[in-house]
Amino acid sequence: MSRVGKYPVTVPAGVTITVKDNVVTAKGKLGEMTYTAAGEVETRLEDNLIWVKPLSETKHARQQWGTTRARINNLVRGVSEGFSRKLELVGVGYKAAAQGKVLKLSLGFSHDVDFPIPEDLKITTPAPNQIEISGVDKQRVGQIASEIRSYRSPEPYKGKGVKYAGEQILRKEGKKK
């Protein structure tokens, strides 16, 4: 039995949910999102609770049960609170600046990296060595944060690079004489 799937998703005040043919649509103060659930599960809206139930006892149906419930929960949280991810730039001369629809990154290359800011996300730079990515879709926020981090992943000797806020970089010892 799924430990995640057996609990309902609570719909907060200010969020409107519609469920039709396993398509869940959520509207909130931050926007609107839609999720199409897998065919092996059934979704129902009762009062202010969204229940997810597997249609059969197959292994795949049980796998989709918890996944669907988690995705619907992220959908509801996204349109009500939103998601954000913070990145830190560590290194001499490493800096970022959001200019219009482009994020300019100086990461020690011979040129600046221009990263186009997607329409559905908001990217801010509270400090020259910090980037904050926020949006409605949890997967999209994490994907863009990962793409920005991949330009210069933290290296293990000095820890220079783009890292997630609070991330611990495994450090190595240098060569011994």
From Swiss-Prot:
GO terms for cellular component: cytosolic large ribosomal subunit. One of its GO terms (biological process) is cytoplasmic translation. One of its GO terms (molecular function) is rRNA binding. The keyword Ribosomal protein applies. It comes from the Bacteria. This protein binds to the 23S rRNA, and is important in its secondary structure. It is located near the subunit interface in the base of the L7/L12 stalk, and near the tRNA binding site of the peptidyltransferase center. This is Large ribosomal subunit protein uL6. It comes from Rhodospirillum rubrum (strain ATCC 11170 / ATH 1.1.1 / DSM 467 / LMG 4362 / NCIMB 8255 / S1). The lineage of its organism: Bacteria, Pseudomonadati, Pseudomonadota, Alphaproteobacteria, Rhodospirillales. The gene is rplF.
